[in-house]
Design a protein with these regions (language model features):
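A short alpha-helix capping/helix-coil boundary motif
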Residues: 1-2, 22-23, 132-135
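Residue-level signal for pocket-adjacent positions within structured domains
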Residues: 6-9, 30-32, 62-65, 93, ...
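Short beta-strands and strand-loop turn motifs
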Residues: 2-6, 57-59
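Phosphate-binding core of ATP-grasp and ATP-grasp-like enzymes
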Residues: 83-91, 98-140, 148-180
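N-terminal glycine-rich "phosphate-gripper" loop used for MgATP/nucleotide binding
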Residues: 1, 10-14
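Active-site nucleotide/adenylate-binding loops and adjacent lid/helix of ATP-dependent enzymes
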Residues: 13-93, 99, 110-111, 140-152, ...
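Short amphipathic alpha-helical segments
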Residues: 1, 68, 107
Length: 180
């Protein structure tokens, strides 16, 4: 039918946080260090290697479902089980916890190029095991240099994932002029 839209391969990458992390690492996108694990024991080893605090993530959910910030080893098993429950995958992601401010970035991609970018402040409600966005504020107030770095990182992510002919929505951490 030759309809335009996101390529299947890009959708596969962008709907699995571990595959996305692999693609981003290969594409030079700034991201938290992390490891794919298949057991609570592997999660424990990954957390020790990365250093606490870490984030244990379900790889195939959105809305922060299946995501737990882990401060010490006594929390790993429960965090691993929380991430595995409800997942179609046999692995989860353990990442180094990033400090900074979480913002949202929306945009449009045409011919593999980010043609519109709208970084914004996010307002969220945080429950026990989920985060729900309740509002956004546009434009995001930042320096020109930071806006350029956000755009650069987003273009790297678009290129690394193969996203094309689509809208994009990303959660980005900002600390000073650093973007993840």
């Amino acid at each position: 039918m030759h309809l335009s839209g996101i390529p299947y391969e890009a959708a596969e990458i962008l709907t699995d946080k571990a595959k996305m992390k692999d693609a981003f690492r290969q594409g030079g996108v700034s991201a938290a260090d992390g490891m794919r694990v298949r057991s609570a024991e592997e999660a424990q080893k990954a957390a020790e290697q990365l250093g606490y605090p870490v984030v244990v993530k379900r790889v195939d959910s959105s809305g922060s479902r299946g995501i737990t910030v882990v401060e010490h080893s006594g929390q790993i098993e429960e965090a691993y089980e929380n991430a595995r429950n409800g997942s179609a995958r046999d692995y989860v992601l353990v990442e180094k916890f990033l400090r900074g401010t979480e913002i949202g970035v929306d945009g449009f991609v045409q011919n593999h190029k980010l043609v519109f970018l709208a970084p914004h402040t996010k307002f969220v409600y945080r429950g026990a095991h989920t985060t729900v966005p309740v509002g956004h504020a546009f434009p995001y107030g930042c320096s020109g240099a930071l806006r350029e770095e956000i755009a650069r990182q987003m273009q790297l992510a678009v290129t690394a994932s193969g996203a094309d002919q689509c809208s994009v929505n990303a959660d980005v951490f900002v600390d000073g002029e650093k973007v993840w």
